[in-house]
């Protein structure tokens, strides 16, 4: 069996609400930490989400 190319990551809200998304990324092509703007329903606005490890 070969090692999986995609890994699951957790996108944590920078608004410190504790809200997060779980998504996948290709660790070979995207070596830097992922940052994206998504909707945070707790803060009720779009904020940046930064990559963190899934525990």
Curated annotation (Swiss-Prot):
Instruction: Reply yes or no: does the keyword Ribonucleoprotein apply.
Output: yes
**An individual GO BP term:** translation
Domain of life the protein comes from: Bacteria
Could you name the Gene Ontology cellular component terms for this entry? cytosolic large ribosomal subunit
Q: Which GO terms describe its molecular function?
A: structural constituent of ribosome
| Species name | Methylorubrum extorquens (strain PA1)
This protein is called: Large ribosomal subunit protein bL33
Q: Which family does it belong to?
A: Belongs to the bacterial ribosomal protein bL33 family.
Q: Which residues form the signal peptide?
A: none
Report any Pfam family annotated for this entry: Ribosomal_L33
Keywords annotated in UniProt: Ribonucleoprotein, Ribosomal protein
The record's listing under Gene3D superfamilies reads: Ribosomal protein L33
């Amino acid at each position: 069996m070969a090692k999986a190319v995609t890994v699951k990551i957790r996108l944590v809200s920078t608004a410190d609400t504790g809200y997060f998304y779980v998504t996948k990324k290709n660790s070979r092509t995207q070596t830097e930490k992922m940052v994206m703007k998504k909707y945070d329903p707790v803060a009720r606005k779009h904020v940046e989400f930064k990559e963190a490890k899934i525990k």
